[in-house]
């Protein structure tokens, strides 16, 4: 008879096998039938605010970052939303409008990652901490937004997610529930669990190459991804404006503007395929 610990271990192994199979049936890291495709590496890319800064999206932690106008507690926590939902909605409405300005466009780094996905197909996964849609506009489709998406809202009661490009007003409600509920930004706030973590950790365990771009290394769990990838044998690469807080964890490092170092590295990688 299995002990309680044995039952837990058995259940964990079954869940892990089930999740691995589900991932293989999804959009990334699925083995191909064609022999040539089997030789291509599985590449997992993590992007942070640094990749979008050159497109005009202001970063959180730079000297001129958004947090200077508002306290984090006021605009990026569930408690802040409960205290003053109109302030929080106004904050994200302004960011949503900025994202849709014609001058905000994907830069060369975004385009290079779309090119890399074109070459690797479902052996490529992009995990982003950014809530903008510049990766999708550049052409990437295998994307997990672990911190949510600015152009979406969700019902504060049921969690149903809706596409949303305009401002959110106090009168806007979700009608999916018996009683219309307020909408909130589809953004992961401080103290909330990032999205897609099961898929991300499984992908980290399967990756041959892990690349971090434009990340500070301050925010967990993303800052720990390089260590997780290394544990499973992945080659690790940092492409950043300057060394991140976890830069010493990476085997290969290139520093400079994302629009310069990312295309250069992608070309180097593609030549080796």
Curated annotation (Swiss-Prot):
It is found in: Cytoplasm. Substrate binds at residues 92, 95. Its EC number is 2.3.1.286. The active site is at 147 (proton acceptor). Zn(2+) binds at residues 155, 174. Binds 1 zinc ion per subunit. It catalyses: N(6)-acetyl-L-lysyl-[protein] + NAD(+) + H2O = 2''-O-acetyl-ADP-D-ribose + nicotinamide + L-lysyl-[protein]; N(6)-succinyl-L-lysyl-[protein] + NAD(+) + H2O = 2''-O-succinyl-ADP-D-ribose + nicotinamide + L-lysyl-[protein]; N(6)-(2-hydroxyisobutanoyl)-L-lysyl-[protein] + NAD(+) + H2O = 2''-O-(2-hydroxyisobutanoyl)-ADP-D-ribose + nicotinamide + L-lysyl-[protein]. Keywords: Cytoplasm, Metal-binding, NAD, Transferase, Zinc. Its cofactor is Zn(2+). PANTHER family: NAD-DEPENDENT PROTEIN DEACYLASE, NAD-DEPENDENT PROTEIN DEACYLASE SIRTUIN-5, MITOCHONDRIAL-RELATED. Belongs to the sirtuin family. Class III subfamily. 2 residues (Tyr-92 and Arg-95) present in a large hydrophobic pocket are probably involved in substrate specificity. They are important for desuccinylation activity, but dispensable for deacetylation activity. This is NAD-dependent protein deacylase.
